[in-house]
Amino acid sequence: MQINKPDNTLQNISVGSKEINAARVAFFLPGFVISTWAPMIPMVKARLKLEADVLGRLLLCIGISAFIFMPLAGALVQRFGCKKVVITGATLMALISVLLSCLQNIWSYAIALAFFVAVMGATDVSMNTNAVIVEKLAGRRLLSGMHAFWSIGCFASAGLFSVLASSGSNVTLIATLHCAIVLALLAVFGRHLLDYKIPGGEKAFAIPRGIVIVLGILACISFLVEGAVMDWSGVLLTEVKNMDIALAGTGYAIFSVAMLIMRLLGDKTVQFLGEQKAVIGGSIVTAAGFALVVVLDNLYLNAFAFILIGLGCANIVPVFYSLLKYQKGMPISAAVTSVTSLGYTGVILGPALLGFVAHGINISAVFELVALLLVIEAGIAKYVFCKLKM
């Protein structure tokens, strides 16, 4: 069944099950490729003989390159459309991941990695633009489930990488097989991505303003939350809670699984609760999880706290993207570009900010600060929904 939306800019686009599945695959592929590259980092560190601080600075600079390039993604969508940008971006990411597996020089590796992350930024913007439009035209909630497919891609890639590596396959062969999977999925689903372009006369890039900049700031806080669990949960469990080093990764693993499950259930959950309750309630639940992690010392109670964090924050970012379809101040792709760019400041600057807090005060203060930011996020979100009159 095809569902048509009578909109002046979208009247020639129809959405059915093929377009919805293609949008899900558009999220799966970048997650799949990123989790192909991530396990290579220790191998690359050893092969290029990099010290930890050099590797850290390299990764920070690469992250900044994505942030700089991301605002140009709207222009790419305007000129070429969502379909071409997603297909080209996912293809280049897969091919570059193979290149990253075999480069022997730090400078060539840095250039290739910078290009990889820049392409990832453009793909991120275009896939979210495609998803927002698909949800708008379909007339039902879809974004939480689509974001779940990013996580599914990460899990699938990491699992396949581990199986192949344990069987003795070298990293270049593994990356090549992963690349082939990406290209095969693009061949099947890529043609059903939306060929949406920004209408003539509308700017592809605009300085974020009004409700869009507020949503971008909220997205920044939400990305910072995910980064805090990823970067600092292991340190908290081992150094503050005095747990065995073997348990260092349990917090992030529990958080990731809880987030994935809730995102798979997220569209129906948000539809039942409403967007406002899902965001504000999710922020409060997540803040409670961070507070409990600080005060509880039992392994199982800490696991419960990380479950709360994963469940609470799972649907916040998808709802922020979904809200962009209600605003009238900017074209959808420009609004998505703005929110994504501002959100990624939490990924890029968050680890450094939290590191200063951990060094200047203590590690527990990192989680206390994030809990406070989440309470502030809930208050600002209330203002956003009032402005949108929802």
Positions of predicted regions on the chain:
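Helix-breaking motifs and short loop linkers at transmembrane-helix boundaries and internal kinks
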Residues: K49, G81, C102-W107, N242, ...
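Intracellular juxtamembrane helix-capping segments at the cytosolic ends
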Residues: G121-K136, N315-K328
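Primarily marks hydrophobic transmembrane alpha-helices of the MFS/SLC 12-helix fold
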Residues: K83-V86, V279
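C-terminal ends and interior cores of transmembrane alpha-helices
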Residues: T91-Q104, V285-D297
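Helix-to-loop junctions at the C-terminal end of transmembrane segments
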Residues: F69-G81, A165, M262-G274, A358-H359
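Short amphipathic helix-loop junctions that connect adjacent transmembrane helices
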Residues: P39-D53, D231-L247
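Symmetry-related core transmembrane helices of the 12-TM Major Facilitator Superfamily/SLC fold
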Residues: T172-G190, F367-Y383
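C-terminal transmembrane helical hairpin of 12-TM major facilitator-type secondary transporters
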Residues: Q276-F320
